[in-house]
Amino acid sequence: KMVDAVCRSGDCSLTPLAAVAGSFSDLALEKSLEFGAERVIINNGGDIALKDITGNIIKVGIPVNNKELVLSIDSQSKINGICTSGIGGRSFTKGIATASVVLGETAAMADACATCIGNAADVESDGIVRCYAEEIDSETDIPGNLVTLSVGELSKKEIYRALLNGIETAEKLYNENIIKGSILCIKDKIVMFPENSSYFTLEKIYA
């Protein structure tokens, strides 16, 4: 499952570990349903597998920059995975996304694609500090790859360029029916693709 998710993401720089957290969430979801659960939400450090077989809407909060985005998921949508990648997460990122959120049919697929889109959401800027992955973790699975350490002040042009790079990747994955949607946040800017979906809504932003 991990290998398949990474291969389908189209990012040849990813290893199977890009989908490990989502895959374990999927496994916990499957086992819960086998034991008769009707509404299951498994949150593995922000990589979520979810399913409601009763037909009720599932709401998921995503904290970003002291705000909370609230996603409402239609139980008929086949969205069973919501995963997040970006700066400050448990894993490395090559991009500058505050949060790269992906909705997919499985958490494994959403996990790999959140990493892929997060990596693509990038721009060259003096405000970005990077280093090689092995300088932080000698046992990393991506030695030789530059990863983002911190993101300082960015111009609006730099932010919009990075958002565009990320959302173009999201659009490609969406058009190939690999993901159900994506939300990308850089600093205080937030974009969603597709902008209008019958399967999910970005309901509210709580300050």
Placement of each model-derived feature along the sequence:
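Conserved glycine-rich phosphate/nucleotide-binding loop
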Residues: 55, 61-62, 196-207
